[in-house]
Every structure is written in structure tokens, then in C-alpha cells.
A protein has these predicted regions:
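Functional-site microenvironments in short loops/helix caps that host divalent-cation chemistry
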Residues: 51, 87-221
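Short, P/G- and charge-enriched loop/turn segments at secondary-structure junctions
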Residues: 29-32, 55-58, 210-216
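Bacterial N-terminal signal peptides that target proteins for export
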Residues: 1-7
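A short glycine-rich, aromatic-capped structural motif
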Residues: 36-87, 98-102, 178
Length: 232
């Protein structure tokens, strides 16, 4: 799923190709750099209180400020630090999957980041008002990638990051409902807590307060991650 652009116009330019052609050639790598830079963008979640937990047992807690990746970590990003990671052609900007908790932690650490706690992830997804989904309380399959997308010509498969940006969280984080479950640094006894739901499950798993427990060294094609960074 990945490809690298190769530029073969050097000899033509040396022979006196017009200025227009030279401009077009030089613009291509610039545009690709800007697109790649986009996927490293982070959004700030300010310090303060928010409603945490499932309805009926939710509570108000306070967290310090932090930044979180706007998008799930992509195949291309992950492969820069894990040379053994292979993926299909065309998948550069799909969320990485089939990664363990340790691999996710190592990737974040290489960027001077870390995995979010369950509470940090949930605040980044729902804001302060306790909403059920990043965009509000009513489910809308157009705003996320879940198995409800299997009809009307949309297949229930993993999608490129940022495919449903109209469903972004109050802080601008994308794909917080569906696409792939995401590792957190939180544990429930010996199990790691995953958040966000995936293309494989339905609307209930995609709720901001839903979670899934997993063995830390388990890998699945519907589990990925994103990183956070402390705001100093």
C-alpha cells in the first residue's frame, strides 16, 4: 500500500525545459511534504473537568492539559520506526494495525510522546459535556467508520485516517469513533484498555465511554493507536 515518488526530469531541466515545467516538478514534492506533515498534527485538550464514564455511573474528573494526535498513527508513520512493518500498496495513510501495546508505546516514545490514558482519550473524544459520540448524542454512520457502513455501497473495512472529519471531536481529533480500536496506557487488572470502536463493530462500541479489554501482546487487524504529549 505505499509508493515513493521518483523524479526523472533533471536531464530535461538541464537541457532548458521551460520555467513552467520546472515549477510543476518542484511543486510536487512540496505538496507531498505538506500532506505528510498534516498527519503529524496534534490538537490541544485544555486542562479542566469533564464527565467521565458510562451513563449511570459517570463522574466529573479533572485532567491537566495535553496534546493528542489529530489522526491515528498511519502505516507510513509507523514504518519509519519499525522497518519490519509491511503493508499493502496504497496504504500509506491508513491507520496502522496489527501492533502490540509495546510496539505502540515504543513508537510514541521515539517521538517524545506517549500513549494516552483511558481518561485522556475519553476527554479528547467527548469534550466536557458527556456526549455519547464525538459529534453529539445521536449516532450518524456518515460521521464514522463502523459496521453500519456495510450497506448503501459502503463496505465495512478500514478507511484512510481523516475520512470522516465532519465527525471530529470538540477539540478537532479525527476518527475517535470507529475505524480502529486504539491502545491506551490504562489497565484493568492484567488487561489493557482499548478505546474508540472499529470498522468491525457497531455504534455501541463507537461511543466515547465504551472500552474493550485486550491482552497487551495481542495484535489484531482492527487495533491501532495515537499518541499524546504533555503540555508544559
Amino acid at each position: 500500500m505505499g509508493s515513493k515518488a521518483a523524479f526523472v526530469f533533471l536531464t530535461m531541466l538541464a537541457a532548458g525545459v521551460s520555467g513552467i515545467g520546472a515549477s510543476e516538478a518542484s511543486d510536487q514534492p512540496s505538496a507531498k511534504k505538506e500532506k505528510a506533515k498534516k498527519y503529524y498534527e496534534m490538537v490541544v485538550v485544555p486542562a479542566g473537568k469533564f464527565i467521565y464514564g458510562t451513563p449511570g455511573s459517570s463522574k466529573e474528573i479533572s485532567l491537566p492539559a495535553f496534546s493528542i494526535d489529530k489522526y491515528e498513527v498511519t502505516n507510513k508513520q509507523f514504518s519509519k520506526f519499525n522497518l519490519d512493518h509491511k503493508y499493502d500498496k496504497g496504504g500509506d495513510n491508513y491507520p496502522v494495525a496489527m501492533v502490540s501495546l509495546a510496539e505502540a508505546k515504543d513508537h510514541c516514545a521515539a517521538l517524545d510522546k506517549r500513549l494516552p490514558t483511558e481518561q485522556e482519550w475519553e476527554k479528547a473524544a467527548r469534550g466536557t459535556d458527556g456526549r455519547a459520540y464525538p459529534w453529539g448524542d445521536e449516532f450518524d454512520k456518515v460521521l464514522c467508520i463502523t459496521n453500519e457502513n456495510a450497506d448503501e455501497g459502503r463496505t465495512s473495512i478500514i478507511a484512510p485516517v481523516g475520512s470522516c472529519e465532519k465527525g471530529n471531536s470538540p477539540y478537532g481529533a479525527a476518527d475517535m469513533a470507529g475505524n480502529v480500536w486504539e491502545w491506551t496506557s490504562s489497565f484493568d487488572e492484567r488487561y489493557s484498555v482499548l478505546k474508540g470502536g472499529s470498522f468491525f463493530e457497531g455504534r455501541n462500541s463507537a461511543k466515547t465511554f465504551s472500552s474493550l479489554l485486550s491482552i497487551p501482546d495481542d495484535v489484531k487487524d482492527y487495533v491501532g493507536f495515537r499518541c499524546v504529549k504533555d503540555v508544559k
